[in-house]
Amino acid sequence: MDRSKENCISGPVKATAPVGGPKRVLVTQQFPCQNPLPVNSGQAQRVLCPSNSSQRIPLQAQKLVSSHKPVQNQKQKQLQATSVPHPVSRPLNNTQKSKQPLPSAPENNPEEELASKQKNEESKKRQWALEDFEIGRPLGKGKFGNVYLAREKQSKFILALKVLFKAQLEKAGVEHQLRREVEIQSHLRHPNILRLYGYFHDATRVYLILEYAPLGTVYRELQKLSKFDEQRTATYITELANALSYCHSKRVIHRDIKPENLLLGSAGELKIADFGWSVHAPSSRRTTLCGTLDYLPPEMIEGRMHDEKVDLWSLGVLCYEFLVGKPPFEANTYQETYKRISRVEFTFPDFVTEGARDLISRLLKHNPSQRPMLREVLEHPWITANSSKPSNCQNKESASKQS
C-alpha cells in the first residue's frame, strides 16, 4: 500500500523593499474569519500593497507613522522569526461582511495571485462543520460508518454525507485508504464519476461531502431485476468505459469495480464511487493484492505486477454479471474461485448472444497485454449496436488537461 503524501510549504518568506516607494511586506497569515483580527499596539500590521501606491490597512489598525524606515526594520525582525505555512492573500476591509478579497492590485505577479486563490480554497474546506448541514434519512451502512442524505443549510443543496468513525478506521489500519480516496476522488471531474465536494472531521469522526445519487446502487438494481438486458448492459459498459478512460488518462487505476461501487444518478446515469482502493500510478505498476475476490484478475491473485489493465478485466466480469446475474468465476469456496480465475474457467448460458460473448472473452484474457484498449471496447460492434450512450473516449486528451 502506498501512503498518502502530505504537502507543506516550509521556510520563512522574506519581504523585499522596492526602491523609491512604500515598502511591500507580506502578511504572515490569512484572516480565517470574517472580521479582521485585532492588532496589538506594539506590533505593526503587515499588509501587501503595490509599490507605487499607498498602503491599504484595515481601518481599526491604522496609525500614524513618522517615516517608513523604522517600521520596515521592525517588520523585518518579525518576519525573520515567523514561518509562513501557506501562501497568503490580501486582507479584508473591516467593513466587509463577506469573505471576498478586495479588488486586486495590478497583476504583476501571477504566481502570487494563484497562490492566494489556492489558499482561499483550502481555507473554505477547513470551515465546514456538522452544524452546516441538516441530516436526513440513512442511505446506506458500511463497515466503518454510515451514509446519510443531507442538505447544506445556507444553499439548500442536497448531498450525501458519509460519516466514518476514526476508531474503527485506526483499528482496521485503513486510514491510508481514506486519505487516498479523498486525494484522488476530490480531483476527478467526470459525469460518470461521483463528486467529492469536500471533507471535515471532529474528535471522533470523519465526514465526506459527496454527490447524491438518488437511484441508489447498481447492485440493488441488479438484485431487483436478477439480470439486465443487452441494451442496459451495453449502456452501462459504455458509461463505465468512458469514466475509466478519463481515470487512466489521469494515471488513476480504480482496482475495485463492482456493482456495489456503482451508483445511479437522477437520470439513471452510472457513476463510479468508492475510490478507497484506487491509486495514482505514475509507474503504472502495482503489486498490492486488493479489491473484491470475484473481480480480481489473475495477475493480482498470483502476486504479479499489474497496471490499468486490471480495470479491463473487471469490466469483463461486470459485463458478464449484468447479463447473467452472477459473476463468471463464482464458486462455493474462496480456493475454488481463485483456481477458476487463475485458469480463466467460465462458461456462458445459452441466452448470451455471440456479440456479448465475443466482448467478454476478449476482456477476460489471462495475459493483460492481450486485453483490448478501452477505445476498442467502445468501438466493439455489440456495444455500438446496443448502447444508448455515445462514446467520448476520443476526448481523452482534452480530459487529461482538466483540473
Curated annotation (Swiss-Prot):
PROSITE patterns: PROTEIN_KINASE_ATP (PS00107), PROTEIN_KINASE_DOM (PS50011), PROTEIN_KINASE_ST (PS00108). Keywords: ATP-binding, Cell cycle, Cell division, Cell membrane, Cell projection, Cilium, Cilium biogenesis/degradation, Cytoplasm, Cytoskeleton, Isopeptide bond, Kinase, Membrane, Microtubule, Mitosis, Nucleotide-binding, Phosphoprotein, Proto-oncogene, Serine/threonine-protein kinase, Transferase, Ubl conjugation. ATP binds at K143, K162, E211, Y212, A213, E260, N261, D274. The lineage of its organism: Eukaryota, Metazoa, Chordata, Craniata, Vertebrata. GO terms for cellular component: axon hillock; basolateral plasma membrane; centriole; centrosome; chromosome passenger complex; ciliary basal body; cytosol; germinal vesicle. There is a cross-link at K258 (Glycyl lysine isopeptide (Lys-Gly) (interchain with G-Cter in SUMO2)). It is an enzyme of class 2 (transferase). Changing V174M: In a metastatic melanoma sample; somatic mutation; constitutively enhanced kinase activity. The active site is at D256 (proton acceptor). It catalyses: L-seryl-[protein] + ATP = O-phospho-L-seryl-[protein] + ADP + H(+); L-threonyl-[protein] + ATP = O-phospho-L-threonyl-[protein] + ADP + H(+). Mitotic serine/threonine kinase that contributes to the regulation of cell cycle progression. Associates with the centrosome and the spindle microtubules during mitosis and plays a critical role in various mitotic events including the establishment of mitotic spindle, centrosome duplication, centrosome separation as well as maturation, chromosomal alignment, spindle assembly checkpoint, and cytokinesis. Required for normal spindle positioning during mitosis and for the localization of NUMA1 and DCTN1 to the cell cortex during metaphase. Required for initial activation of CDK1 at centrosomes. Highly expressed in testis and weakly in skeletal muscle, thymus and spleen. Also highly expressed in colon, ovarian, prostate, neuroblastoma, breast and cervical cancer cell lines. The modification Phosphothreonine is found at T287, T288. It is found in: Cytoplasm, Cytoskeleton, Microtubule organizing center, Centrosome; Cytoplasm, Cytoskeleton, Spindle pole; Cytoplasm, Cytoskeleton, Microtubule organizing center, Centrosome, Centriole; Cell projection, Neuron projection. Residues 1-125 are annotated as: Disordered. The keyword DNA repair does not apply. Activated by phosphorylation at Thr-288; this brings about a change in the conformation of the activation segment. Phosphorylation at Thr-288 varies during the cell cycle and is highest during M phase. Autophosphorylated at Thr-288 upon TPX2 binding. Thr-288 can be phosphorylated by several kinases, including PAK and PKA. Protein phosphatase type 1 (PP1) binds AURKA and inhibits its activity by dephosphorylating Thr-288 during mitosis. Phosphorylation at Ser-342 decreases the kinase activity. PPP2CA controls degradation by dephosphorylating Ser-51 at the end of mitosis. This is Aurora kinase A. InterPro entries: Aur-like, AURKA, Kinase-like_dom_sf, Prot_kinase_dom, Protein_kinase_ATP_BS, Ser/Thr_kinase_AS. The modification Phosphoserine is found at S41, S51, S342. Part of a complex composed of NEDD9, AURKA and CTTN; within the complex NEDD9 acts as a scaffold protein and is required for complex formation. Identified in a complex with AUNIP and NIN. Interacts with FBXL7. Interacts with CPEB1, JTB, TACC1, TPX2, PPP2CA, as well as with the protein phosphatase type 1 (PP1) isoforms PPP1CA, PPP1CB and PPP1CC. Also interacts with its substrates ARHGEF2, BORA, KIF2A, PARD3, and p53/TP53. Interaction with BORA promotes phosphorylation of PLK1. Interacts with CIMAP3. Interacts with GADD45A, competing with its oligomerization. Changing F346A: Decreases the interaction with phosphatase type 1 isoforms. Induction: Expression is cell-cycle regulated, low in G1/S, accumulates during G2/M, and decreases rapidly after. Residues 27-83, 91-101 have a biased composition (Polar residues).
